[in-house]
Design a protein with these regions (language model features):
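Extracellular loop-to-transmembrane helix junctions
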Residues: 2-19, 76-106, 116, 177-183, ...
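Selective recognition of specific alpha-helical transmembrane segments in multi-pass small-molecule
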Residues: 10-20, 135, 140-142, 210-215, ...
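Juxtamembrane transmembrane-helix boundary signature
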Residues: 14-38, 60, 90-114, 195, ...
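Membrane-interface "cap" regions at the ends of multi-pass membrane proteins
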Residues: 16-70, 295, 299
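Transmembrane-helix boundary/entry motifs in multi-pass membrane transporters
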Residues: 42-57, 61, 108-140, 171-175
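Membrane-interface helix-loop-helix modules in multi-pass membrane proteins
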Residues: 51-110, 121-125, 142-158, 333-351
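Hydrophobic, membrane-embedded alpha-helices of multi-pass small-molecule transporters
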Residues: 52-68, 229-245, 259, 271-278, ...
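Hydrophobic alpha-helical segments and their helix-loop junctions in multi-pass secondary transporters
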Residues: 191-195, 210-233, 242-243, 263-287
Length: 351
């Protein structure tokens, strides 16, 4: 089957889900454009900052869309592309997007409280403690895994027979590391300029794109060749800064710039499908059991998580995005819209 047809069908389903089901939820839940959001009522210039809806969308999408929707869809394809596609579409429209939208809605309607405080309010202190303990343990695992992966990716050295030397990919790895560091630096510059200029629309996009291009252009020509240990320290230093700096200074501009990379990746994939018209070479269905991976249930639903439904997204919706929503009407595109776009990304990875 032509993969372009698969992507078009998926896109139509996801757009329809956003337009009809997402809008129905917004109406059913009582989204009020005239209501004062926590970002407006509690504006402190740190965590609670009224922000343009598309900027919040960029933050939400960049925060939830990482390697998960890409690698998950590819890994689950051992069961065939049809069950993976069906789960991405059904899960994304009726589970994932609803979860993200619902968490965002609940937080905005409750003074911007994070998920832990919401659980304390509606379930009790024991529920809150259990949830926060789980989040703490989960975060430790994720941070440790990703820090090691990132440091390993940027590492310029390799050890062969007990001898440490520069690897053949030292320059490439160093350039990738430089781009990442400069990306953070330019994100701060972007945040400072945006704070002063208050640009919106195309002006904000041009400024963000210019900072993104500058980070790539300089980083590719000035590789930082260093060890994995050094990169590990740098990664944890960045994690600390991201945790303590105001939203508008680092996280929001960083995610806004990251969206350009995701958009470029999606656009490139679509252009490739339109030009090449590749056929789906994977079998439609290989059976309920796979010798290497196990049974379709629960493996399919474990591997395709971020592309269909992920509880982690609720931490983003209630932890950061809810505190920057300037108008309740933006909640649908931020909560529901970012998730269905991630589902489309998963479909592209599958194709």
């Amino acid at each position: 089957m032509n993969t372009l047809v698969i992507v078009l069908i998926a896109a139509v389903c996801l757009i329809a889900g956003y337009t009809f089901y997402g809008s129905w939820l917004a109406k059913k839940w009582g989204i009020d454009p005239k209501a004062k959001t926590p970002a407006v009522a509690k504006n402190d210039g740190q965590d609670y900052v009224p922000t343009d809806g598309w900027t919040v969308f960029a933050h939400q999408f960049s925060s939830i869309a990482g390697a998960g929707p890409v690698t998950g869809a590819i890994q689950a394809a051992v069961f065939g592309w049809v069950p993976v596609l069906l789960w991405i579409l059904i899960g994304g429209i009726f589970f994932g997007a609803v979860t993200d939208f619902g968490a965002l809605y609940a937080s905005v309607k409750n003074e911007g409280k994070s998920m832990g405080l919401l659980i304390e309010k509606y379930i009790g202190k024991t529920g809150k403690k259990l949830f926060l303990l789980f989040c703490w343990l989960f975060t430790l695992i994720v941070i440790a895994a990703f820090a090691d992966m990132v440091a390993g990716t940027f590492n310029a050295y390799e050890t062969v027979d007990g001898v440490t030397k520069l690897s053949a990919q030292a320059t490439v790895n160093g350039a990738a590391g430089s781009i990442s560091l400069l990306f953070i630096a330019f994100a701060v510059v972007f945040g400072l300029l945006q704070k002063k200029l208050q640009w919106k629309g195309w002006k904000e996009m041009v400024l963000g794109l210019a900072c993104t291009v500058a980070a790539f252009a300089i980083g590719m020509n000035v590789p930082l060749v260093t060890s994995k240990a050094t990169w590990t320290y740098l990664v944890f230093a960045y994690i600390f800064l991201a945790a303590v700096l105001p939203m508008w200074l680092l996280m929001q501009p960083r995610d806004f710039m990251t969206t350009f990379m995701f958009a470029g990746m999606i656009l490139g994939a679509v252009v490739g499908l339109v030009v090449a018209h590749p056929k789906m070479n994977l079998p439609m269905y290989t059976g309920f059991h796979n010798a290497a991976s196990g049974d379709l249930f629960p493996i399919l639903f474990v591997t395709v998580a971020c592309g269909a439904v992920s509880g982690f997204h609720s931490l983003v919706s209630s932890g950061t995005s809810s505190k920057t929503i300037a108008n309740e009407k933006d909640m649908q595109k931020v909560g529901y819209g970012a998730m269905v776009l991630e589902s489309l990304l998963a479909v592209l990875a599958l194709c």
